[in-house]
Each structure stands twice: as structure tokens, then as C-alpha cells.
Amino acid sequence: MCGLARTSADPPEFIVMGGDIAHHGGEFRPTKWLPLPGNVQPSPLVAPYAKIASVCPGSLFEAIHPKKSSTEPFMLPNGPIHDDAGVAVESLEKFTEFDAQENVFAMIAHDRSLLDVVEFYPKPANGWREKGWKEQGRWRFLNDFDTSVETKEAE
């Protein structure tokens, strides 16, 4: 079950609360509507709201993507946590269309990557766009991926 909340009438802004539609941002990002940018800004490897401008090359994450893609999610729902992985994928495909809208802030339950980005109840979620929540949080999940390069010496 997902919820859609209007957070502003003029301009129209919304938060779509995906609940357990996904368990990680990599299940619904990137997409053809919201591709991995050439430069991820702010960098997911730097704390949100850092005083310095932070940029990270998108190619760093595209290189570790299972399909080397900038337009397909990093992972698909699978395993016993999903009753029906096919239905989960269909639901996520619909969710990604909300996620790509500039006036919609898409979030899922238990998203650790947003803990230092959003404010919590009883503070209001109105003004999320002005507060920069979407821009600060959109690619934060990428910090969960190991971008280190391993090298093997020839034996």
C-alpha cells in the first residue's frame, strides 16, 4: 500500500509514500525517466548539506551496476521477502513514474539514506522542495554500494 499526500496546492507538490514497495533505493533507481546523471550532485559519498560543493561522477556507479546501465534499477525484487516478485516489479515500475516527477518526493519505509536528510514528526513535511530533501536524498542510496576497486597481482 502506498500513500500520496499533497504538501502544497500552489505550486502543486506531493510526497508519495511507498511503504514497503521497495526495501532499497536501488530497486527503483535509476530509470529511463530518471537516469543516473553524468555527475551525481550532491555526492552520495559526502554528508548531506555539507558546506562544500560535492560532485561524484555517475560513471563510478555505472561501472558497478550489474548491467552497466544508467537507466535500469541496480537490483530487482527477489527472494522470499516478496510474495510475488513479478507483481513487485510491476508496482515498482508505476512508482518510478512518480519518482521522476519534479513536484513529487518519493520515499520508501525504512530508508536509512534519508535519516540525515528529512525532518521527522511532529515537524511538517510541507516545504520539502525548498528544504532540498529530494535533491539531497535522491541518490543517497548509492553510498551503500562498494565503489572501491580491487586489483589482483599476476602470480
Question: What residue spans do the PLM features occupy?
Answer:
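Short beta-strand scaffold segments in enzyme catalytic cores
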Residues: 1-4
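Cap/insert and terminal regions of metallo-dependent hydrolase folds
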Residues: 8-155
